[in-house]
């Protein structure tokens, strides 16, 4: 897959910054000179939230190909940094939905993301999940010196001290060869064993890619990032925080010019929840009739899906996902056409929504879109939640 014109500009901006970084040996000065060259010195005030570590941000709208941009950024960043024996990437994501999507794509040798990384690193690439790292599965001192090691991890599995988070701090006999090969850590992590996964990654001094980085600006998140001991931090987001060091930005008009916005966005405001419900059902039915009437339908199957956004539990008189399911059934919709997808309930697990054999036409969620869930058949979003955010749904 070739980079779009706006994506080429983003990578060109990154390369220019890296050139300036090599010339100045000062990441803040390089940032200042970069924006000075673009006649925008006011944008060149570097926010040093990670002292000693270059920290840049790509501001790209949702659907603009941030993941592919990150894949294209890995090689230039490593080429610009001082030589190291190991090349490790920590790829941080904010949710399990994005985690599974990213892991699946990066492990798939036929996927454009993996093909790009393979091309840049001579196919000497290994992609790891947290569990694979904990198990020492193809993860050892010899392997990490001979390949690019990409570790796809969730924020919560490293910034929390719950049961899952603690695994990264605990003694791990599977990783003992690392502690022998790497020696005493220069930057020991508090309360982490020398054989702990977190400490081993710390000693590899990885490039850290932070997907949806606006979710990683709390004190706990910054502590997590520092504990990774990164050589470089690259933020990816459509809605950067004010302390982000934006090195390149893309607007929605550029996406439209490159045909990245493939469908019109039509917004309706209804007076009450009943109208939202019935209008969404009617619109979905009309879309399915149109899809079935197309002569090419036999070659390209389409089953339009409504994504209903309900209120979280615990709010009195709110339309929670249980109540919403009951209302849909009361209108005559078969129960097998309805599924719930929340942080606690996932009725979509092991379901192929694109299969003609799948009956699901209505999915009830709370924060699935915010968490990165995606489905090509989900043409309609009907929100019954009381939303006030200006940047998410």
Where are these regions (language model features)?
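RecA-like P-loop NTPase motor core of helicase/translocase proteins
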Residues: 1-393
